[in-house]
């Protein structure tokens, strides 16, 4: 079962792994020493309605916590470096557009399925929550021509972009993995940044991007979890990669 085909919660169409990830973020927020504070995931989980126990267990809490913090740090560093154009690919119930302290000129594009984006935006709007940056939803499936939809929504491929594919790449078929990287590379201006978590036994993303003039680095998932003092038991054997286009 992947994030692309896992069954959704009743009446919402939101896939179970996205909901499980939101539950893990809720648990981290309520822990004694949270790596981040995400007050909005609880709103989304509540709005989604009842879940089966096995659905909530799809995401490993310690791994999700460390991964969320790692991507938070990536975004904040990119923003501090002057990147004002942010693209989140298939973010699910991610709430960074509402919870991170973005600079005033930041524009955040979220590319995801229409029902997912509508559910998230409507739930948070009803709760009186407003984004902390200019928020632009791009309702399109990643299997479709999402670069065209992204450009139509106001994205500028001439400006440096911070790209993020969190919890996505390893769940794509190999052909779609290649297509995703090719499109990101094609629409990335010099100085753009990228962050992804990938399968340790999957394609060599670092090598692929380095061959296309990206300066890349990688960290094994257990090392990221150790950095943030989270238990790696049961966590995927992933690799966190990030880099900058030269």
Curated annotation (Swiss-Prot):
GO biological process annotations for this chain's record?
A: methylation
- InterPro entries with a match to the protein in the record: Ppm1/Ppm2/Tcmp, SAM-dependent_MTases_sf, SAM_mthyl_Trfase_ML2640-like
Q: What is its EC number?
A: 2.1.1.-
Enzyme's top EC category: transferase
- Which residues of this UniProt protein bind S-adenosyl-L-methionine? 112, 141-142
Q: Which is an annotated GO molecular function term of this record? A: methyltransferase activity
The alphabetized UniProt keywords are:
Methyltransferase, S-adenosyl-L-methionine, Transferase
Q: Which Gene3D superfamilies match?
A: Vaccinia Virus protein VP39
Q: Which Pfam families match?
A: LCM
Q: What does this protein do?
A: Exhibits S-adenosyl-L-methionine-dependent methyltransferase activity.
Name the family.
Answer: Belongs to the UPF0677 family.
- From the Swiss-Prot or TrEMBL record, give the protein name: Putative S-adenosyl-L-methionine-dependent methyltransferase Mflv_0168
């Amino acid at each position: 079962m992947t994030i692309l085909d896992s069954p959704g919660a009743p009446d919402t169409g939101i896939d179970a792994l996205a909901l499980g990830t939101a539950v893990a973020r809720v648990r981290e927020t309520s822990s004694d020493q949270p790596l981040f504070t995400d007050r909005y995931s609880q709103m989304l989980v509540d709005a989604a309605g009842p879940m089966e126990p096995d659905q909530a267990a799809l995401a490993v809490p310690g791994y999700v916590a460390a991964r969320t913090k790692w991507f938070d740090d990536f975004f904040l560093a990119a923003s501090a470096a002057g990147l004002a154009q942010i693209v989140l690919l298939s973010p699910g119930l991610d709430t960074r557009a509402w919870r991170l302290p973005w600079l005033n000129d930041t524009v955040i594009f979220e590319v995801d399925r229409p029902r997912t984006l509508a559910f998230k935006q409507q739930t948070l709007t009803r709760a009186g929550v407003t984004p902390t940056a200019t928020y632009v939803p791009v309702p399109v499936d990643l299997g479709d021509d999402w670069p065209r939809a992204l450009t139509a929504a106001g994205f500028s491929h001439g400006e440096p972009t911070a790209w993020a594919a969190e919890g996505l790449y390893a769940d794509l078929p190999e052909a779609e993995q290649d297509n995703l990287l090719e499109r990101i590379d094609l629409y990335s201006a010099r100085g753009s940044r990228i962050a992804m978590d990938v399968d340790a036994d999957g394609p060599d993303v670092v090598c692929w991007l380095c061959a296309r003039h990206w300066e890349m680095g990688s960290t094994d998932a257990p090392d990221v979890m150790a950095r943030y003092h989270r238990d790696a038991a049961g966590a995927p054997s992933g690799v966190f990669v990030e880099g900058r286009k030269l």
